[in-house]
A protein has these predicted regions:
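His/Asp/Glu-enriched, well-ordered alpha-helical/loop segment
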Residues: 1-4, 9, 14-21, 25, ...
Length: 158
């Protein structure tokens, strides 16, 4: 079933991350915020907190279960690929970006865990629901990616 989670978790410091990990709380940040709200963070977040602002890498490093989401329809770009690009290439501070495997895990397995459905979703394995997207481009060049096909419940959406 549903799990305890903190949506956004945008200004978490080391003490908050450790406490969340110890309590088994799932972090659900929105990487698209790094792209879409960057000017607001640069203008309003105090310098001493800036590098902790949506520090996705720190969430993984703290040992949290992390599930990425889009926060749609609040954001203009309800597009996981924009969020993926931001997680990989657009941290607010150098060194806070996450790796490709972490980002894909957070959008798939992490998201399934966060919604309490990891027994059905989040993996391409026998017995799991067949929900996935096929991407064109290079995963190592996220700006080149586009969705070429989606499949939901085993049915392709052409």
């Amino acid at each position: 079933g549903p799990r305890h989670r903190i949506e956004h978790f945008g200004l978490a410091g080391p003490e908050h991350l450790a406490k969340a990990r110890d309590l088994g709380i799932i972090a659900v940040p929105q990487p698209v915020f790094l792209n879409e709200l960057r000017a607001n963070y640069e203008r309003y977040v105090p310098d001493q907190w800036f590098c902790r602002c949506f520090n996705l890498k720190a969430m993984f490093d703290a040992g949290l279960t992390v599930a990425f989401s889009s926060d749609g329809p609040v954001v203009r770009q309800v597009d996981p690929l924009v969020g993926l690009r931001a997680a990989l290439k657009e941290p607010l501070c150098a060194g806070n970006e996450v790796g490709l495997e972490q980002a894909l895990w957070a959008y798939t397995t992490g998201a399934a865990i966060a919604q309490g459905d990891e027994g059905n979703r989040g993996r391409l394995e026998a017995g799991y629901w067949t929900d996935f997207v096929m991407l064109e481009g290079s995963l190592h060049e996220p700006e080149s990616l586009s969705v070429s096909r989606t499949t939901v419940g085993g049915t392709p959406d052409l």
